[in-house]
A protein has these predicted regions:
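Catalytic phosphate/nucleotide-handling subdomain of diverse soluble enzymes
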Residues: 297-308, 403-407, 431-434
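Beta-strand segments within the central parallel beta-sheet cores of soluble alpha/beta enzyme folds
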Residues: 74-82, 96-99, 126-130, 157-160, ...
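Flexible glycine-/small-residue-enriched beta->alpha junction loops
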Residues: 144, 148-202
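Glycine- and Gly-Pro-enriched alpha-helical subdomains that act as flexible
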Residues: 171, 300-350, 368
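Conserved catalytic cysteine-centered active-site region
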Residues: 4, 9, 52, 80-154, ...
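N-terminal extracellular/periplasmic Venus flytrap/periplasmic-binding protein-like
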Residues: 7-23, 28-32, 37-40, 51-52, ...
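Conserved active-site "lid/cap" helical segment
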Residues: 13-106, 110-118, 125, 197-206, ...
Length: 435
């Protein structure tokens, strides 16, 4: 194994060994994805997961990973959860200790317990990461890094967010000394304010944003009607409570519920601004939906995948993060994507599909324009405006979606990216290996 890893490293260091030809090479030491799936995405506080807790959905998803991959769970060496706001109380569906509370920032407790309950033995590790909206991709990167370093052979990355049970508010202002720095103070700006800043600073009109949003809904509607989401989604059985009677019943959630069929530019233009105190361009129709959901990615060393007879869906090439001014955090992908492509000497037109998170139409329009991308290549199945944006899940959800689309279209070079609160962007590069 050490010799394989050394040869792989040396191959990357050879002069001229960059570009598409380099990233599409297959080496025993590559990090590969053998399974990528997600739950349906449902409306927060209204949809099928409104009464489902974070620990339960992670548990249910990990059980699906084991069942669908047919991997021996004893071979899993680490599980990493990307999550922004963990729920307050462990699920009564899974754990029977009503006196225990798990506070925000304690997602590591939840993922450890959920992984054990799902059948992954205590010999595996578990951890959580939080880089806001890139947390799912960050979890993938963390598992991939361990594989690349030889620390583990197999790991699972999960991204999950149950926004029905949590918000995203900064409860305590920063220290006065910290606030003397304007960019530090800007980190406290609400996301809606940063969206309006992007619209104002870069002249992204309300009409442009509504046109973009309508197209996101159109694409998502078409994809859902054609059944394109079916192979990336696993149905999840959970319980929902009737808000009037308090009665609980078991339901199986099998499809995204945020796609509004028949959405048009005209219908979007009639929606009132969502953040009138900051501006008049961002609305509930051209911004991402508040959503519950989760996604998981099974990663391993290529040689191990071949040994186990696991199907190789894609190669994880790399991921990177970049910073931008916090007050316009939405433009993060315009820094992260070029940085990523430059590292691997890839031209933007050599990428077949881009998944760029649609936190707000303002940032989505700006990113497509600023990067000079062919919009047809960006979010071909729609994005967060139509599907929803469960914060910690998005980075992993995008991988499930882009690999499904690549399987359908035979696309090869794939990029996922998202903006990140406080002024960052992250991007990941993948090579589709599905026939």
């Amino acid at each position: 194994m050490a010799a394989e890893r050394l040869n792989s490293i040396l191959s990357h260091l050879r002069p001229g060994n960059k570009g598409v030809a380099a990233i599409t090479q297959k080496n025993p030491d590559d990090v590969v994805i053998t399974l990528s799936l997600r739950t349906p995405l449902t409306k927060a506080r209204k949809g099928g997961f409104k009464d489902t807790d974070l620990d339960y959905i992670v548990y249910a998803l990990l059980k699906e990973v084991i069942a669908k991959s047919q991997i021996d769970p004893a071979l899993v060496e680490d599980v990493c959860l990307g999550n922004v706001r963990s729920t307050i109380k462990p699920s009564a569906q899974l754990f029977k200790y009503d006196s225990i509370s798990v506070n925000d920032g304690k997602a590591a407790y939840l993922v450890r317990a959920a992984s054990l309950a799902a059948g992954i033995p205590h010999t595996a590790g578990a951890s959580s990461v939080n880089r806001f909206c890139s947390s799912g991709l960050k979890a993938v990167q963390d598992i991939a890094n361990q594989i690349q370093l030889g620390a583990i052979d197999i790991g699972v990355a999960v991204g999950a967010e149950m926004m029905s049970a949590s918000g995203d508010r900064l409860n305590k202002p920063f220290n006065d000394e910290v606030l003397k720095n304007q960019e530090a103070a800007d980190c406290m700006q609400p996301m809606g304010q940063t969206s309006e800043n992007v619209g104002k600073d870069f002249n992204i009109s309300r009409a442009q944003q509504d046109v973009y949003a309508a197209e996101s809904f159109r694409r998502a509607e078409a994809a859902q009607k054609e059944g394109w989401f079916d192979d990336e989604i696993v149905p999840i059985t959970t319980r929902v409570k009737d808000p009037k009677t308090g009665e609980e019943k078991s339901v199986t959630v099998s499809k995204d519920d945020g796609v509004r069929y028949g959405t048009t530019v005209d219908s979007l233009s009639k929606i009132r601004p969502a953040f009138p105190q900051f501006g008049d361009k961002s609305t509930g129709g051209n911004s991402s939906q508040v959503t519950d959901g989760a996604a998981a990615v099974l990663l391993m060393r290529r040689s191990k995948a071949i040994e186990l007879g696991q199907p190789i869906l894609a190669k994880f090439v790399g991921a990177t993060v970049a910073g931008v001014p916090p007050r316009v955090m939405g433009i993060g992908p315009t820094a992260a994507i070029p940085k990523l492509l430059e590292k691997f000497n890839i031209e933007k037109n050599e990428v077949d599909i881009y998944e760029i998170n649609e936190a707000f139409a303002s940032m989505a329009v700006y990113c497509v324009q600023n990067l000079g991308l062919d919009h047809a290549k960006v979010n071909p199945r729609g994005g967060a405006i139509a599907l929803g944006h469960p914060l910690g899940a998005t980075g992993a959800r995008q991988i499930a979606t882009i690999l499904s689309e690549a399987r359908r279209t035979k696309a090869k070079v794939l990029v996922t990216s998202m903006c990140i609160g406080t002024g960052q962007g992250m991007a990941g590069l993948f090579v589709n290996e599905q026939s």
